[in-house]
A protein has these predicted regions:
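Beta1/beta-strand and adjacent pyrophosphate-binding region of the FAD-binding site
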Residues: 1-12, 30
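Conserved N-terminal helical subregion
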Residues: 1-3, 77-99
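A structure-centric signal for secondary-structure junctions around beta-strands
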Residues: 3, 26, 70-72
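Glycine-rich FAD pyrophosphate-binding loop
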Residues: 7, 23-42
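N-terminal Rossmann-fold NAD(P) dinucleotide-binding loop
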Residues: 15-16
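Short amphipathic alpha-helical segments, especially helix-boundary/capping motifs
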Residues: 24-31, 48-49, 83-90
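N-terminal FAD cofactor-binding segment of flavoenzymes
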Residues: 39-80
Length: 99
């Protein structure tokens, strides 16, 4: 492709998503990524509120098979003897997700 309407740099979750959605709308999109995916990277996880967009893109099953489901968050404090607090998404106010 010699020309494009949109050049997206970075094929992580955000870059891949915006590229797919713009392409659906008819834009000529070029996505550039230097790394191979999937790869381990802090912050890449399957958060419950991302499920609707993954469903819309038709990739939820593939992403779930990678195994990055995030069921909650744990906070550890070096200032409190290494104590931690864990919060699970299933205890959140919004119950429209499976975990």
């Amino acid at each position: 492709m010699d020309q494009c309407d949109v050049l997206v740099i970075g094929g992580g979750p955000a870059g891949s998503t915006v590229s797919s959605l713009l392409s659906e709308k008819g834009w000529k999109v070029v996505l550039l990524e230097k790394d191979n995916y999937p790869r381990f990277h802090i912050g890449e996880s399957l958060l419950p509120m991302s499920l609707p967009i993954l469903d819309r893109l038709g990739v939820r099953d593939k992403v779930e098979k990678i195994g990055m489901i995030k069921r909650g968050a744990e906070f550890v404090s070096q200032y409190h003897n290494g104590s931690s607090a864990t919060y699970y998404f299933k205890g959140a106010r919004n119950k429209n997700h499976p975990y």
